[in-house]
Swiss-Prot record:
Its cofactor is Mg(2+); Mn(2+). It is an enzyme of class 1 (oxidoreductase). Pathway: Isoprenoid biosynthesis; isopentenyl diphosphate biosynthesis via DXP pathway; isopentenyl diphosphate from 1-deoxy-D-xylulose 5-phosphate: step 1/6. Gene3D superfamilies: 1.10.1740.10, NAD(P)-binding Rossmann-like Domain. It catalyses: 2-C-methyl-D-erythritol 4-phosphate + NADP(+) = 1-deoxy-D-xylulose 5-phosphate + NADPH + H(+). Catalyzes the NADPH-dependent rearrangement and reduction of 1-deoxy-D-xylulose-5-phosphate (DXP) to 2-C-methyl-D-erythritol 4-phosphate (MEP). One of its GO terms (biological process) is isopentenyl diphosphate biosynthetic process, methylerythritol 4-phosphate pathway involved in terpenoid biosynthetic process. One of its GO terms (molecular function) is NADPH binding. The keyword Protein transport does not apply. It comes from the Bacteria. This is 1-deoxy-D-xylulose 5-phosphate reductoisomerase. The lineage of its organism: Bacteria, Pseudomonadati, Pseudomonadota, Gammaproteobacteria, Cellvibrionales. Belongs to the DXR family. Pfam families: DXP_redisom_C, DXP_reductoisom, DXPR_C.
Length: 398
């Protein structure tokens, strides 16, 4: 084996970032951390820097950077501390970097992930919002700059593993030429799968974040509870695998053992199974096309005993319907959907908005802004900003 591969972890203090560093720590001969980034959790970032000794640590603002640098110097750590958006893009596209874990949550991850793509990196994509907001621009940049895109979302990673030869070139060729009839995108149904609909107005952030199977951050936990997460994943799948929404079917699978399936034109259905632990798709993408140990326990099928499937109830999960409508509409609709959802989820977590009001706010924002075709990154960002502003105005009146 040659030199260790150099990696930048964008969003190192989040759930995916922490899991990524866990896998990396098991293979010091294969991977070397070049940079770690965080939004504001400088204490955890300091701990990670002490363990992994990256060349750079990047945090959002100067105040946090000062606190981080003070702590690192006190501990004798020589990691250089940077801050701000330009620094994020710099460590994502640096010539010394071989791969980038793109795990910043939400729209904030768009620019640094795009910087990694434009630098031709191997990009491990955990930020689905990048493709939801700017799928056309992003996939075009991947092709133009020779970047390699590997999915980290457990469902999309499962789909990738079930496709022929595991080739990361479906952005160009699509699925039909590979004999694929459709993708079966599985969803647990979240913590409110069986909750009476009339009770959803009273659920709390704590209940929404208590996912029955997965350990995740707050934002994605709420998205899972509303099934917006599955809606965003539907849009992501269309861009990642160059396919139409008609070829993607969402299936409720409460056990979260089958992470997704691919049906072929000959009637074969291939599925990827495993314990619900994000270290599996992370390890797969890190080492692809090889395999490495992830720290995840073996799946015990005897203990699993049964696997259940059902169709999603769009009356219970209107966010899924909104996402399905947005991907069919195209244009600025997915941008508006994502931006309004981020505002709505933040308000719910702050107890300023009821859980059942999340889809209402999103729908109101999408109705308030005319359809357009944002053909540049600047227009995408403008549409995102407009949707956030409208959402905040509506929220203030509710």
């Amino acid at each position: 084996m040659g030199r260790p591969e150099s990696i930048t972890v964008l969003g190192a203090t989040g759930s995916i970032g922490v899991s990524t560093l866990d896998v990396i720590s098991r293979h010091p001969e294969r991977y070397q951390v070049y940079a770690l980034t965080a939004e504001r959790r400088w204490q955890l970032l300091a701990t990670q820097c002490l363990e992994h000794q990256p060349r750079y640590a990047v945090i959002r603002d100067a105040d946090s950077a000062g606190l981080l640098e003070q702590e690192l110097r006190k501990q004798g750590c020589l990691t250089e501390v940077l801050y701000g958006a330009d620094a994020l893009a710099s460590v994502a596209g640096a010539s010394e970097v071989d791969m980038v874990m793109a795990a910043i949550v939400g729209a904030a991850g768009l620019l640094p992930t795009l910087a990694a793509v434009k630098a031709g990196k191997k990009v491990l994509l955990a930020n689905k919002e990048v493709l939801v907001m700017a799928g056309g621009l992003f996939t075009q940049a991947v092709a133009e700059h020779g970047a390699q895109l590997l999915p980290i979302d457990s469902e999309h990673n499962a789909i990738f593993q079930c496709l022929p030869n595991h080739r990361p070139d479906y952005l160009q060729q699509g699925l039909i030429s590979s004999g694929v009839r459709k993708i079966l995108l599985t969803a647990s149904g979240g913590p409110f799968r069986n909750t009476p609909i009339h009770e959803l107005a009273r659920v709390t952030p704590e209940q929404a974040c208590a996912h029955p199977n997965w350990s995740m951050g707050q934002k994605i936990s709420v998205d899972s509870a509303s099934m917006m997460n599955k809606g965003l994943e539907l849009i992501e799948a269309c861009w990642l695998f160059n396919t139409s929404p008609r070829q993607v079917e969402v299936v409720i699978h409460p056990q979260s053992v089958i992470h997704s399936m691919v049906e072929y034109i000959d009637g074969s259905v291939l599925a990827q199974l495993g314990n619900p632990d994000m270290r599996t798709p992370i390890a797969h993408a890190l080492a692809w096309p090889e395999r490495i140990e992830s720290g995840v326990a073996s799946l015990d099928l005897i203990m699993t005993a049964r696997l259940d499937f059902s169709a999603p109830d769009v009356q219970r999960f209107p966010c899924l319907r909104l996402a399905q409508e947005a991907v069919v509409s195209g244009g600025n609709a997915p941008v508006l959907l994502n931006a309004a959802n981020e505002i709505a989820v933040a308000a719910f977590l702050e107890r300023r908005l009821g859980f059942d009001q999340i889809p209402r706010l999103i729908s109101s924002v999408m109705d308030a802004i005319p359809f357009s075709e944002p053909e540049t990154l600047e227009l995408v960002q403008a549409a995102d900003a407009e949707a956030r502003a409208v959402a905040m105005q509506l929220l203030a009146r509710w």
